[in-house]
A protein has these predicted regions:
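Short glycine-dipeptide loop
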Residues: 71, 145-151
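Class I SAM-dependent methyltransferase SAM/SAH-binding core
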Residues: 50-111, 136
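Conserved hydrophobic residues forming the short capping helix/wall of the S-adenosyl-L-methionine
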Residues: 69, 91, 172, 201, ...
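Conserved Class I S-adenosyl-L-methionine
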Residues: 2-3, 12, 20, 24, ...
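A short acidic, Gly/Pro-enriched loop at the edge of an enzyme's catalytic core
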Residues: 107-122
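Conserved class I S-adenosyl-L-methionine
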Residues: 2-49, 60-64, 86, 105-108
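Conserved catalytic/acceptor-binding region of the Class I
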Residues: 135, 150-222, 238
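A short SAM/SAH-binding and catalytic strip from SAM-dependent methyltransferases
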Residues: 120-135, 157
């Protein structure tokens, strides 16, 4: 049984935020799927391998890892009960049987007691930035790997190189938009500085750290109006809209729709660039 020490994130991901992500999982996959192949290739998952997916959410990358190792196994770990329920249902619907999902805190989860371990690879697509104590978490993840086991993760780089951030900051004259996090503090951009990533992984005992930039376009909506509605329903957008009066909300929605209109493609869909770090390391 995991002791949950990351209580702030536990409350967030088992409340409205977790419910939102579970409900809109297909949309979030449309945003982030461009990172799947680089991530899984970097993890070097082979048939028979056991893979640990950290912050697995609704389990899309966990299922992809399981498909790469039909005679292996994939374990998805997340704090969010709503997203894990979705993950289990989708695995059943897809007929993927070599996958399991567990609710737990990567900082403290007793991986050494897991029947699925030790693991050949640990992966994370945008799920490793929210630890209250990242050194503790990554140290625990390292111990879950076999000697020679491999870590591969994708995490956002500079906020200004991510189109959704640029879209939201365009509203600063209308809504009280602050920054979206910074290296060293739990949040989306806690690992945005490569030196911070190297320091955390070194403190956790990882070796052979590599960090390279990777970019992908994600689909945020079927048109600018739909994309604006979606962005304003996400965690940051929802909090900003809740803090504003109705005239400000209407102005923000119109301004964001106008901004996103410049990113509509030939079929009308809105595609925004995301820039991330692809990080790998090993347990020696």
């Amino acid at each position: 049984v995991t002791t949950i020490v990351n209580t702030d994130q536990d409350q967030a991901w088992n409340g409205p935020e977790g419910a939102h992500w579970a409900r809109h999982q297909d949309r979030w996959n449309a945003v982030n799927d461009g990172f799947n192949t680089p991530l899984l290739d970097a993890a070097r998952i082979a048939d028979g391998h056991r893979t640990l997916d950290i912050g697995c959410g609704a389990g899309h990358t966990t299922r992809l890892a399981a498909l790469r190792a039909p005679h292996g196994h994939a374990l998805g770990l997340d704090l969010s009960g709503p997203m894990l329920a979705e993950a289990r249902a989708r695995a059943v619907a897809d007929g993927i049987h070599n996958v399991t999902f567990t609710r737990g805190d990567a900082q403290t989860h007793p991986f050494e007691q897991s029947a699925e371990g030790p693991f050949d690879a640990a992966i994370s697509r945008y799920g490793a930035m929210f630890f209250a104590d990242p050194e503790l978490a990554f140290g625990n993840i390292r111990r879950a790997l076999r000697p020679g086991g491999r870590l591969a993760l994708v995490c956002p780089s500079d906020p200004e190189l991510n189109g959704w951030v640029t879209a939201m900051t365009s509203l600063r004259g209308i809504l009280p938009v602050g920054d979206f996090g910074r290296p060293g503090l739990p949040g989306m951009f806690s690992l945005a500085a490569p030196d911070r990533v190297r320091a955390v992984l070194a403190a956790a005992g990882f070796t052979g750290v590599t960090i390279e930039e990777t970019r992908a376009y994600g689909t945020w909506g079927r048109d600018a109006t739909d994309a604006a509605d979606f962005l304003l329903a996400t965690g940051p957008g929802r909090h900003l809209m809740d803090s504003a009066d109705e005239p400000a909300r209407a102005r923000a929605r119109a301004a964001l729709t106008d901004h996103l209109g410049a990113h509509e493609t030939a079929d009308g869909t809105v595609r925004l660039l995301s820039t991330a770090w692809l990080v790998t390391a090993e347990r020696s």
